[in-house]
């Protein structure tokens, strides 16, 4: 249904945001070294 589609999209967006945040942290850490 519509609600499960919304939840799935939200989960995918959250995972993508977490990956992007993790990559940004790694980039900042490597530049700080």
Curated annotation (Swiss-Prot):
GO cellular component: extracellular region
Subcellular location: Secreted
Superkingdom classification of source: Eukaryota
Principal subcellular localization: secreted
Gene Ontology biological process terms in this record: defense response
Residue list for modification Leucine amide: 33
InterPro entries: Dermaseptin_dom (IPR022731)
Keyword field: Amidation, Amphibian defense peptide, Antimicrobial, Secreted
Pfam families assigned: DD_K
Tissue note: Expressed by the skin glands.
Family: Belongs to the frog skin active peptide (FSAP) family. Dermaseptin subfamily.
Function: Has antimicrobial activity.
Protein name: Dermaseptin-H6
Originating organism: Pithecopus hypochondrialis
